[in-house]
């Protein structure tokens, strides 16, 4: 990492301020070539955490005013010498300032390269780096809080404490096995078992919160389904807060899938308003029905809508069959009209049924509560450690599996060496989670998801 990188760190759009970030051994010297300070002092003469007003020059011509902020290694985001040039936020202006920096010796940064350098320089671990991306892309307040908690080290501290328990047990076993003639007390089976179970319970707790954690950070694929004209599109509009789907009294109005991302309580839903499910001779409508069934298979959460003002028919019951063994909330719409639906049948078939009038906007609070309960986000504490990425889940499950093998080996009386192999494998999995022993390919994959400039 001897080279110096640069990129626009703010969105490329018109705005009040644009920031060009430069990081690397020669960052300050390169910035001195393009910034002439109002005071006449060079940036190289400034201490870290110092700002200087000046002008940016491209090919000896002033192109904008700026404020240059100097950070000296290791006290910077990347752990390297860093300069952030804040200029006016026009698209052309920021591109021209970046051009001046690149002409002066920096190279364009790759996607996520600033944060990757922060990771490689020990400024943050891999789980914290992933939290940076989650914080940037957060769409809900709970997701933002959870991402910041992870960035602030909540997950890292939890994993480190669990690793410490395992490493202590492993060291005691290794010492007793390697130095049998020394007066090292043998680690009792009960003590060893307690250590393994303590860590196992901690990992199980983390896994139990994974779905809820992922729901508030990444959002949930949600399908709105039902037969034609039960109010699916009206529900979509109610949750969206505006007319996203066309609503008419004509059955089969929605044929294609209409999508929208909305925040409902603590969770972000990626809604899909699907075509009404029924047998049809209309080719276009039939294609829409097939697409709806495919979306049901993909969905994590299903909102099944029924017309409360009409009796349940065979189409309704076929929809219930599609929902078997899935996370489903039954929504009885048109609660403003006299009820004719078999509510007892719905309640016996579905774990949760709520009543709304999408047309009148009634029942939204009850529906929000039902969604949060179904996803487990109603009880989640965003200040506590949680795993929110698939990579973290895989590492946690791998460590848990190794500990279960260790317990089995202990219970059947296998040697301490055999048990220790399982414990060491669990530690390896946890160290991969935090990135302390992650493979290069894993690290590259994590940072490939970042934007340039971060």
Model-derived features with residue positions:
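Inter-motif core of Ras-like GTPase G domains
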Residues: 285-309
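Generic enzyme active-site microenvironment
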Residues: 271, 305, 331
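Short glycine-/polar-rich loops that comprise or flank the Walker A/P-loop
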Residues: 15-17, 49-51, 298-302, 325-328, ...
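Short alpha-helix of the ABC ATPase nucleotide-binding domain corresponding to the H-loop/switch region
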Residues: 251, 277, 285-289
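C-terminal-of-GTPase-core extension/linker across diverse P-loop GTPases
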Residues: 2-8, 12, 141-263, 280, ...
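Short glycine-/small-residue-rich Rossmann-like dinucleotide-binding loops
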Residues: 240, 275-276, 300, 307, ...
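A glycine-rich (often HGG/GG-containing) alpha/beta subdomain
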Residues: 1-145, 149, 153, 329
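Switch I (G2) and immediately adjacent beta-strands of P-loop GTPase domains
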Residues: 52-64, 68-72, 252-280, 298-301
